[in-house]
Amino acid sequence: RVVLTPFWIVAGPDFEAMRDAGCLDGAGHCEYKELWWHNSSGGLDRPPFERGDLRALYQEGFARGLWHPEYHGRSHFDTAAWAAYLAEGDHITALYFEAGLTYYHYGRLNASSRSFHSIHSEYLSDDGQFQKGPAQLTAWTHEGLRAFEAFWGYASRVTAMPCHYGGPEMGGVFAAAGVAGVEGEEKGRGLLPGLRNSPRLMFDPAFESPRAWEDVLAHTQREAER
């Protein structure tokens, strides 16, 4: 029986709390604040989305055998860089914030770091001044994994890093928390030492040439015969 494996983000930004704390006031200070799935109904229950509390539906999918979630991350994006860009009054970051959104990357050059504004991974900062040290990475990740278990009722044993983007030290961080395997790209991005590595097969020929269907089917056949 085929069961889906959604890689699950356990928390996200609390836009209301951050706004109330002055992140858009131009005061030069902004602290990242979180909404967790295990103790709140999440951001989708709030404006502008207002989709209601979806937690029971998510867990029903697991209870009925539709999917078996595993850990993806705590935020998906670089929260330290995001909060700093808000604090400095960056127009694009504030524009997305007002819409209840973050972003992946845009081309404004940061004068101090000589990096372009990019917040696309929680583990490896594109803007190096915001990179978490080893102790921070461990605490950040282990707290996220505990939140995953609090919501789903079991510990995650497999992960896929956001955007398959993180340093090799993440292998030890995950292994110390009991994670045994990682999914990454076939070319090697996102695979980690010390874990069982599972290269991901892209199953969307729309992104490739028409030959991709043949490649997908051939790969599937080889895997089935192993």
What is each model feature region?
Residues 1-158, 164-198, 214-225:
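Catalytic alpha-helical scaffold of carbohydrate-active enzymes acting on polysaccharides/glycoconjugates
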Residues 203-212:
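A recognition module on extended beta-rich or small alphabeta surfaces enriched in W/G with H and D/E
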